[in-house]
Amino acid sequence: MSEVRVRFAPSPTGFLHIGGLRTALYNYLYAKRNNGKFLLRIEDTDRTRYVEGAIENLLEQLKWAGLDPDEGVVLDDEGNVTEVGECGPYIQSDRVKQGLYQKYIDELIEKGYAYYCFCSKERLDQVKAQQKADGLMPKYDGLCRGISIEDAKKRIANGEEYVIRLKLPENKEITFNDAIKGKITFNTNDMDDQVLIKSDGFPTYHFAVVVDDHLMGITHIVRGDEWISSTAKHVYLYQCFGWDVPEFVHLPVVLNKSGKKLSKRNDDVAVKDFRKKGYLPEAIDNYLALVGWSSEDNQEIMSMEELKHKFDFNRVSKSGGVFDTEKLNWINRHYIKEIENEKLASMLKPYLVEDGVISEDYPEYKLIEIASLFKEELDYMAEITEKVEFLFKDYEMDDDAKEFLNYEKLDELMNALKEEIESVDEIEKEFASGVMKKVQKKTGIKGKDLWMTTRAVVTGNVHGPDLDSIMVVLGKQEVLDRINKALNR
């Protein structure tokens, strides 16, 4: 068997969609499972939709997700777009500039598999409108199919605008096998004479993708199932050239919880948005692998190495995979819990600084306490702001906490705690861990009277995270201010 070579071939028309990342991931995992190569090609033949900076952004998101191409378009160490590999250029517009497609379109025309079409947009619109009115499938009516190459070249020399179309045979069945969907057959009577070269000289997706996949030695074409209806045209082009047809793998669509296709209008779909919220790349990879696929042992938490070992297309579902944010949160929460507190603190800091909760010079030891306090509660990093809000906003006691202000030994308890806190320069973890035992020993107060009364005064609530850590985060002066407020009630 020849080396497995797969490619992810996005268009630089905007942000990387979460469904696109899943397609890239499945390509990557299949390549790694089979000791093959994962290529990245940029398909930018539709220049009207090109977005400046989209290539850099796309490569950055893939790099973040750990999906580094073995070949094709990559980012160098300085963040510049470059290429690695022997089959370049890997950006289609650069391939056009080198004239790579010309010999192949000339071959199709010479063999009678393609023809020049001079129909105007206005005429094409009229034909399609009439077909719709007659209840027919809108497609090109073949007016220019009979124009000879000689006549066509004369018209081109006279300055007439043209495109080049694929000349499909009539009533021919084209069958191909899909690794997920099985055998699929289309009849050419239900297909259109696809434009292969546009009036601007650029190849269309349908022509370029076949030429590029062949020249780059792609063995498995792994893409979304929205391309199934176009695949018969691609198979016919392979047959016209006499090339081996690669294996096709059309992935089920990613759906929202309503069963509709994920859309940027109604759903969070941009990878950059998940990244900004603080989802971890290992969680995103783990979860996306499960959107339409399951491992044989039904394991759900899997590292990239485990995914590489277990992934195959025979367990990919035929129906759409539902993107369930709650399950993503559950998986992300698992990975957050695995992070060391010191590292997690540095990861949480940008969110707290950006939201104005803390300053850049906020003490590291307090950040570590915050990480320790809330790591079990976070679905994603950006949630940290609302989780810690009660520690930083203006101090206020809720009604349940106020009940403890009536405790008969409140003054004795608070004065004992105040005395201990005033004896240190700052509340650090070691002090906080032992201070309540000292207060208990000094006052004889224990249990609920000790702990819940102190919590009510220090936090303004009767429930919440570890009291020791809260005192560290609040700091000496803030804790004393809250104690004094209770004493001066």
UniProtKB/Swiss-Prot annotation:
Domain of life assignment: Bacteria
Coiled-coil blocks: none
Record-linked InterPro entries: aa-tRNA-synth_I_cd-bd, aa-tRNA-synth_I_codon-bd_sub2, aa-tRNA-synth_I_CS, aa_tRNA-synth_I_cd-bd_sf, Glu-tRNA-ligase_bac/mito, Glu/Gln-tRNA-synth, Glu/Gln-tRNA-synth_Ib_cat-dom, GluQ/Sye
EC class (word): ligase
Reactions catalysed, as given in the entry: tRNA(Glu) + L-glutamate + ATP = L-glutamyl-tRNA(Glu) + AMP + diphosphate
Enzyme Commission numbers on file: 6.1.1.17
Listed Gene3D superfamilies: 1.10.10.350, HUPs
Cellular localisation: Cytoplasm
UniProt-listed GO biological process terms: glutamyl-tRNA aminoacylation
UniProt keyword list: Aminoacyl-tRNA synthetase, ATP-binding, Cytoplasm, Ligase, Nucleotide-binding, Protein biosynthesis
GO terms assigned for molecular function: ATP binding; glutamate-tRNA ligase activity; tRNA binding; zinc ion binding
UniProt GO cellular component terms: cytoplasm
Principal subcellular localisation of the protein: cytoplasm
Segments carrying motif 'KMSKS' region: 261-265
Chain span(s) of sequence motif 'HIGH' region: 10-20
Family to which the UniProt record says this protein belongs: Belongs to the class-I aminoacyl-tRNA synthetase family. Glutamate--tRNA ligase type 1 subfamily.
Function: Catalyzes the attachment of glutamate to tRNA(Glu) in a two-step reaction: glutamate is first activated by ATP to form Glu-AMP and then transferred to the acceptor end of tRNA(Glu).
Name of the featured protein: Glutamate--tRNA ligase
Provenance organism: Finegoldia magna (strain ATCC 29328 / DSM 20472 / WAL 2508)
